Amino acid sequence: MGRGGIGGAGLVAAVAKADVENTDSTRGFVKDVKRIIIKVGTAVVTGPNGRLAMGRLGALCEQVKQLNFEGYEVILVTSGAVGVGRQRLKYRKLVNSSFADLQNPQMDMDGKACAAVGQSVLMAIYDTLFSQLDVTSSQLLVTDRDFMDPSFGNQLRETVNSLLDLKVIPVFNENDAISTRRQPYEDSSGIFWDNDSLARLLAQELKADLLIMLSDVEGLYSGPPSDPQSKIIHTYVHEQHGKLISFGEKSRVGRGGMQAKVAAAFTASSKGIPVVIASGFAIDSIIKVMRGEKIGTLFHREANQWGCSKEATAREMAVAARDCSRHLQKLSSEERKKILLDIADALEANEDLITSENQADLDLAQDIGYDKSLVARMTIKPGKIKSLAGSIREIADMEDPISHTLKRTEVAKDLVFEKTYCPLGVLLIIFESRPDALVQIASLAIRSGNGLLLKGGKEAMRSNTILHKVITGAIPDVVGKKLIGLVKNKDEIADLLKLDDVIDLVIPRGSNKLVSQIKAATKIPVLGHADGICHVYIDKSADMDMAKRIVLDAKVDYPAACNAMETLLVHKDLNRTEGLDDLLVELEKEGVVIYGGPVAHDTLKLPKVDSFHHEYNSMACTLEFVDDVQSAIDHINRYGSAHTDCIITTDGKAAETFLQQVDSAAVFHNASTRFCDGARFGLGAEVGISTGRIHARGPVGVDGLLTTRCILRGSGQVVNGDKGVVYTHRELPLQ
């Protein structure tokens, strides 16, 4: 395909339509990219043991194949031949050596011999991988002397253009086996001295639209990537970053390193070729770059015209929240209480503005065509602001949890041990859809003395922004407005999740996919639930009028809630009874679509459910018949999500068995699953519902945002082998 083709518009357009939030405004140029050069370094091609990293190479080839299929012209510049050849020759030398030979000092192998062996091995791997993907590749070996020939450039372009027209992937490498260059490697001739500068030179000669350089780190950092204080630079501006960057150690292999990549990238971008340095360890870095996502470091000739970002970095936001939380903890209980009361008043005073911004979000959501259940969760209904303000006042009136003493023990005479509550530190809450969650979470964070970072969904951006503004406006300067930070850019989440030295707990509130992604991406403890697959079991002794009320409430009251009923289990003896038939008719009248498990499908001719482990979040549910209470328990423990489950029965023994054996965070008897809520439990509000078993479980209120510390009050005691210490370990009254 010639350079006048449609390029990768299909991929970019499709992705942009699917996920606008991922696209960064500074990366909009990718929509016009046609010809791409991808440079992959030795540290990416090989593993720590020097052998080929087949998983990374496979992911690389799959991405190249995808781009090739979409109409992009892709050129690959690869390193790794010397390393691969050295590994192969070491093995060959080992098998041909005697024990005596191995006792002698081992001389390093000639790099040119390693390159000669490694080039064929490396290219054979590329050929095999691309062939499996129905892609043809070609090898082109060059040296710096080739570019000294004035006619070489024309021949190079002619050959590469012919290959690209045939949809062949050109794979370039420096021909180290016959290169006449000697150390130190430097650009004394103005041509190239490693594969980074080769990639830059090829980008210029072949008129590439984009150069992607894959490294063993995620991009360019302000300092060594191993330094926690180093920050990734998403857009390089030479005037701003040129003198501030300090480079760490060079790559463990190869001749380049980040300094060489920066030099090559800066030169290429100065010539008008955008460059992105990104991680070659991620399986989708190239595709993300082509989606316009803010990953890696961008070098662009016009970057200095874009201006410096005035927004705080992820680390700066987290550190500011921690500092403000310490100021908050210094206040008296009454002063902290007053902040909450002021927030409640501010919400009510700004109700019209809040509902106006929320309506703007709703209008946009409906225009885009978001699912009705999502729009329902976004909606701030009439009376909701008053209800939220009331919840905040309830939280303010709760006993102050900070420094609350849980235990006092006399360890020895005049030596007293105390265990007290204290704040966790800084919380990161990532939530979808529900702007009212922002208010609840913020009030609980303030009451518990924690700093807070909030990231809401793009669909409720205006609602979240105005609520954040109103709440922080009520926080006094002595504490600081940055106590609660609002993260507006999705790309910042990845940076925040790396800050395990600053952020103490992550609470994701949203889909199973969101929670799973967060857990996989961070070392910070994560609290929350992935699914809300809640069950109601109607036992054979159930009062069917009661059952009807509970089931209708659990399903219809708020079907998008995580504590709404998703599966209705019924004792087999109730099949075809008047009470159950009446209940099913009422559900259908309310508009509930009922899907059947195998038994219900056969006996009631209901549409068959695909999986019992399914959360509808809408006016739909699953119905299945079970043999007895034990069968119901087994079903719930197998297919449930450990959220909230309920039994309806007049049999006390069956109820107790259910309550004790269902392994869920909340288990009810004769009560709707919709009661599983922090406010309804008297917690004032909740940051979420945890289905885990560590730290907190069920609706998480103020107590779940606290940890403990040990205080020991002595009078000069020393251990000294426990000589002279008489341990009493006597429990003391709490003060």
Swiss-Prot record:
InterPro entries: AceGlu_kinase-like_sf, Ald_DH/histidinol_DH, Ald_DH_C, Ald_DH_N, Aldehyde_DH_dom, Asp/Glu/Uridylate_kinase, G-glutamylP_reductase_CS, Glu/AcGlu_kinase. It catalyses: L-glutamate + ATP = L-glutamyl 5-phosphate + ADP; L-glutamate 5-semialdehyde + phosphate + NADP(+) = L-glutamyl 5-phosphate + NADPH + H(+). PROSITE patterns: GLUTAMATE_5_KINASE, PROA. Gene3D superfamilies: Acetylglutamate kinase-like (3.40.1160.10), Aldehyde Dehydrogenase, Chain A, domain 1 (3.40.605.10), Aldehyde Dehydrogenase, Chain A, domain 2 (3.40.309.10). Feedback regulated by proline. GO terms for biological process: L-proline biosynthetic process; proline biosynthetic process. ATP binds at residues 215-216, 221-226, 255-261. Its EC number is 2.7.2.11, 1.2.1.41. GO terms for cellular component: cytoplasm. Residues 1-315 are annotated as: Glutamate 5-kinase. The keyword Nucleotidyltransferase does not apply. Keywords: Amino-acid biosynthesis, ATP-binding, Kinase, Multifunctional enzyme, NADP, Nucleotide-binding, Oxidoreductase, Proline biosynthesis, Stress response, Transferase. GO terms for molecular function: ATP binding; glutamate 5-kinase activity; glutamate-5-semialdehyde dehydrogenase activity. Substrate binds at residues 79, 176, 195. Pathway: Amino-acid biosynthesis; L-proline biosynthesis; L-glutamate 5-semialdehyde from L-glutamate: step 1/2; Amino-acid biosynthesis; L-proline biosynthesis; L-glutamate 5-semialdehyde from L-glutamate: step 2/2. NCBIfam families: P5CS, PRK00197.1, proA, proB. P5CS plays a key role in proline biosynthesis, leading to osmoregulation in plants. Involved in abiotic stress tolerance. PANTHER family: DELTA-1-PYRROLINE-5-CARBOXYLATE SYNTHASE 2, GLUTAMATE SEMIALDEHYDE DEHYDROGENASE. Tobacco plants over-expressing P5CS1 and P5CS2 have elevated proline levels and display enhanced abiotic stress tolerance. In the N-terminal section; belongs to the glutamate 5-kinase family. In the C-terminal section; belongs to the gamma-glutamyl phosphate reductase family. HAMAP family: ProA (MF_00412), ProB (MF_00456). This is Delta-1-pyrroline-5-carboxylate synthase 2.
